[in-house]
Amino acid sequence: MYPKDKKTYEKLMDCAEKIFAEKGYDKASVREITSAANVNLASIHYHFGSKENLLQELLNRKLEWLNQQRLVALKNLESKSKNKPLKPSQILEAFFGTLLDMLDEKNYGGEMFLRLLGRSTLEPNCLISSISSGKNNAVTEKFRDALFKALPNVPKNEIVWRFHFMVGATSY
């Protein structure tokens, strides 16, 4: 979505991220977000159409960046390996290390976004789950495929469950 007024758009995104992380999506109100951003109450509707679209835009922007970092890390490892299977630890570092790297991204608001992701896992919301699943599925699949190659003697369903457990554990 292209912002109509970049300054107001960014203020809304920043305040919404903070409030969603602190209170959760369901308990955050449009009035509270616009008040924190010090903008007109109608600003969310003007820029995003709805609170739901605001959340979607926020998650899309952050997840696209995070997943791009993950794919770059995996691609770099694969190009260095010269078609040999990667070590499982390398694959996991590429996937989960990007989350830790995001904490250092002060200009990208990594810490607040990770709090939002953690909160969304603790307080499941169908909307948040569907947005993040849609953005993460293709990336997660690439990492699982890399783990399948790295661990050919481990049943695929066991790898899938272990990976799923690790993803869940990062939220707690």
Model-found features: residue ranges?
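N-terminal intrinsically disordered/low-complexity leader segments
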Residues: 1-7, 78
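An amphipathic alpha-helix adjacent to DNA-recognition modules
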Residues: 9-14, 48-71, 75, 85
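Helix-turn-helix
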Residues: 11, 19, 23-61
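Hydrophobic alpha-helical connector segments
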Residues: 72-111
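Amphipathic alpha-helical packing segments from all-alpha helical-bundle domains
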Residues: 90, 108-112, 125-151
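Hydrophobic alpha-helical segments that form the core
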Residues: 112-122, 156-172
